[in-house]
Regions:
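Gly/Ala-rich beta-loop-alpha elbow adjacent to hydrolase catalytic centers
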Residues: 86-90, 94
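A structural "domain/chain start" motif
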Residues: 120, 199-251, 352-364
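Serine hydrolase/lipase
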Residues: 23-29, 36-42, 48-85, 99-217
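Short, surface-exposed "cap/lid" segments of acyl-processing enzymes
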Residues: 1-31
């Protein structure tokens, strides 16, 4: 996204440069050529300069102490597939980067792109000549001005790609370009599509229990506070959390995802111990999602509480992680922060927990 002064410097460098070439030297030479008319493919100069910098960046990609060009792997290995994604400026750069890689010989199906609230990157001639060479899905919403900003204020730009638009309610009008809002909406749509796929038998559900193997068995309860239960997005958060624990625990049983810890008559601790012993579990994991407005301000926070016990009542670890957000936007993103911290803490006490179930995205 456009998070820093340097990002906005890129955004505001709105001159267009000719687009062409099949390698980095050719890209630079082509862009430095004489100014062309609007019938020639041209792109935003700031975005183009940014992408050229990315293509020549040297990084230690394998943690072996050896720096190499960031995209050498995808250029050299035809089995490698990389999803390029970004918000705002990041989305524009991801799109242009994908086309550069295609121009260098990479099949477009190996570099799909998903953008959120991204501006256009080139003129109509560019969209016509190169639009089909990028496997692009653009996510926008009905109130976000950024995707149309270059067309509106400067002219001569055109969007392309498969377009999906979210329809925001009025209460989200202050967050129309916020990535947290896009994250919340995307997860809701993802779960709706996933439910259809599972119902049709196209996709198997993650099992509510996984018993094979020799690692310790963990009985899992996931719930939410009385205050959080009032929010319509909390079911998405709990499902997101459950899926993460299903991925990180080698052996587990999801006992309940509607745990009301505030109801002591139903959820007395002894009942957790009894149920876990019946299941043959070694550990009890209780996760609670809490969210509320602080009394002295209008800030909202999402709090993730994680507790682990042995089945005989011993406390293994108890921790809580919170993040300030809007009451109506950014809640899945805040939950992700809590999960990252909870996962690291869990690993300290339960060595069998898996930390590498997801490949970490690299920020360009």
């Amino acid at each position: 996204g456009s998070a820093s002064k340097s990002d906005w410097t890129v955004n505001l460098n709105t001159d267009k440069v000719p687009y062409g070439g099949s390698d980095l030297a050719g890209f630079i030479e082509y862009a430095e050529g004489p100014e062309k008319d609007k019938t020639v493919p041209m792109v935003h100069k700031g975005f183009n300069d940014y992408v050229n910098t990315v293509l020549e960046t040297m990084v230690d990609t394998n943690d072996d102490g050896i720096d190499e060009v960031l995209f050498n792997e995808i250029l050299a290995n035809t089995d490698t597939r990389v999803l390029l994604t970004g918000h705002s400026l990041g989305g524009a750069v991801a799109t242009l980067l994908a086309e550069r890689l295609v121009s260098m010989g990479v099949d477009k199906n190996r570099v799909p792109v998903i953008t959120f609230g991204a501006p256009a990157i080139g003129n109509a001639a560019f969209a016509e000549a190169y639009g089909d060479s990028v496997d692009l899905r653009r996510i926008t919403n009905n109130a976000d001005p950024v995707p149309g900003s270059l067309q509106t204020f400067f002219g001569g730009y055109k969007q392309f790609g498969k377009h999906h638009k979210y329809n925001l309610s009025r209460k989200l009008s202050d967050f129309q370009h916020d990535m947290g809002m896009y994250f919340d909406y995307s997860m809701r749509e993802y779960y709706a599509a996933l439910d259809k796929a599972e119902a049709a038998g196209v996709r198997e559900k993650l099992p509510l229990q996984k018993l094979e193997g020799s690692d310790p068995l963990v009985a899992v309860w996931i719930g939410s506070s009385r205050e959080a239960d009032k929010r319509d997005y909390v079911p998405d958060i709990k499902r997101f959390v459950m899926n993460e624990y299903q991925m990180m625990l080698p052996r587990y049983v999801i006992v309940d995802t509607e745990t009301k810890l505030y109801d002591d008559s139903v959820y007395a601790m002894e009942k957790f111990y009894q149920k876990a012993r019946e299941l043959g579990a070694d550990y009890i994991l209780i996760v609670e999602i809490d969210g509320r407005v602080l009394n002295d301000c209008e800030k909202w926070y999402i709090n993730m509480n994680q507790s682990v016990f042995t089945v005989d009542g011993g406390l293994v670890t108890m921790n809580s992680f919170a993040r300030f957000v809007s009451p109506v936007s950014g809640n899945i993103q805040a939950t992700t922060f809590g999960l990252e911290q909870s996962r690291e803490e869990l690993k300290k006490h339960l060595p069998f927990v898996k930390l590498d179930q997801h490949a970490s995205p690299r920020r360009l």
